Amino acid sequence: TSVLALLGMEADPLTSREHILLANVLQRAWTAGTDLDLPRLIAQVQEPPFETIGVMGLEQVFPRKDRFTFAMQLNNLLAAPGFEAWMQGVPLDTSRLLFTESGKPRVSVLSIAHLGDQERMFFVTMLLNDLIGWMRQQPGTGTLRAILYMDEIAGYLPPVANPASKPPFLTLLKQ
């Protein structure tokens, strides 16, 4: 969803064929225990390791020509000079943001003011999904473990639209 938001594409999990294709490719890789970096993801968008999506044939749902166009968009994102910075540095890891190596709690302040709108949506969605993944790995407790504070949330959790950041925000609000 965040990659599609970065590309400025619709990320609806039920209607966006790009989302459905990516979800199926990622699901198969995860189930098989296979690592999938962006170059391999792009290759599998062009030539998915499956013939059907749901009960329909892959070519009916997402023809080869359209998959190639989508793969080119992903490749252009990867090849863009500004995207190189996203591939460097310390990986996003909620446990490292919340705790020191010795296990002491810490405060992490993340500023995204310098990013464009699509990059902000990408980062916020990635951060929220990583936080949800971390949260689901924690055993139950009656004490507070973490606080997420975000200023100017309106664009990420609007009342009517459904941007990529909204589903993970709603998941966190339910916890």
Ranges and model annotations:
Residues 1-174:
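P-loop NTPase motor domains
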